[in-house]
Regions:
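C-terminal catalytic histidine-bearing segment of alpha/beta-hydrolase fold enzymes
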Residues: 236-280
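Serine-hydrolase catalytic machinery in alpha/beta-hydrolase-like enzymes
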Residues: 21-45, 49-56, 61-156
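Alpha/beta-hydrolase fold nucleophile elbow
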Residues: 157-168
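Gly/Ala-rich beta-loop-alpha elbow adjacent to hydrolase catalytic centers
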Residues: 167-171, 175
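Short alpha-helix in the alpha/beta-hydrolase fold that links the catalytic acid
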Residues: 104, 222-232
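Short beta-strand/loop motif that positions the catalytic acidic residue
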Residues: 206, 212-214
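A conserved short beta-strand
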Residues: 184-195
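Acidic catalytic loop of the alpha/beta-hydrolase fold
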Residues: 217-221
Length: 280
């Protein structure tokens, strides 16, 4: 038993500290990213977010979503001024559905025009204000519950809805998973430095194009991860556009010391163009 414990411990440590060699077989994309939660360097790269209280000018409000198990989910909703089937699902960073994400949701709402925006609470009400709590919540997250929340959101928006997804960091991976879950209703997927799906057979079921915002200095979603994603998408016969920036992980977060205003503006421009071309 002691030998088995040692082997498992060494395996986890190798994953946590050798991101340049991430080749975890038969491990879900969500679990791969969750390994980072226990890595001190990853925690250091994510300093506590600045205090911010969002006051919506677009009528944003928290709502409850029904799910298949009966356990309700939370979401932040901004409804279009004119009825439309265009929806954008927004996915949080590892902090949770905080006011920074609500602000990003409202920015998308304002920039895209006639669209509904739904930011999903993947932590069921838990919010982190420091890396230790964020790592704990991300490590505890179960993809089954995440998929349940997304299915609840899809049921809420209806069968005629066209669903685009976007997320950052932890939420980047969840954006990918949500687009896979949405099936034929998925029309666009944007990933900001998140863990992509690595199962080619799953990728073959994807119904939309993907825009991957990738910072080349990212030590977590690194070159090996990105190049594998490109190969996997090609093997699945799906369209992937990678926009690379000479920046570090979380460069688009204004609360991060490595925030790059110029690159963030360009990434946002590419994101809006990508969405507008597919949300018609």
């Amino acid at each position: 038993m002691k030998k088995i414990f040692f082997i498992l411990t060494a395996f986890v440590s190798t994953i946590g500290f050798a991101q340049n060699d991430i080749t975890i077989c038969h491990t879900s994309a969500t679990d791969k990213f969750a390994v980072f939660a226990s890595n001190k360097d990853f925690n250091t790269d994510h300093p506590s977010p600045l205090a911010y209280v969002h006051e919506s000018e677009a009528g944003g409000e928290m709502i409850k979503l029904k799910t298949a198990t009966g356990m309700e989910a939370n979401a932040y909703l901004i409804k279009a001024k004119t009825k439309t089937d265009n929806w954008v699902f927004v996915f949080q960073e590892w902090w949770g559905l905080n006011d920074h994400i609500k602000r990003e949701a409202e920015n998308l709402y304002n920039d895209l025009g006639n669209v509904n925006v739904l930011a999903l609470d993947m932590y069921d009400g838990k919010l982190a204000t420091d890396p230790q709590a964020a790592g704990k919540y991300m490590g505890e997250f179960k993809q089954d519950r995440g998929t349940e929340i997304v299915n609840g959101a899809i049921a809420y928006v209806g069968k005629s809805a066209k669903v685009a997804t976007i997320g950052w960091c932890f939420g980047g991976g969840q954006s990918m998973q949500a687009s896979l879950t949405a099936g034929k209703q998925a029309v666009a997927c944007v990933i900001y430095y998140g863990m992509p799906e690595g199962d080619v057979e799953r990728l073959k079921t994807l119904n939309c194009d993907v825009l991957d915002i990738w910072p080349t200095k990212d030590g977590w979603i690194n070159k090996d991860v990105t190049e594998k994603f490109e190969k996997d998408m090609a093997a699945a016969g799906k369209k992937l556009t990678v926009k690379s920036y000479d920046a570090d992980h979380a460069f688009a977060n204004p609360s991060n010391p490595k925030y790059n205003k110029e690159f963030t503006a360009d990434a946002n421009k590419n994101t809006l163009e990508f969405f507008k071309a597919r949300l018609k």
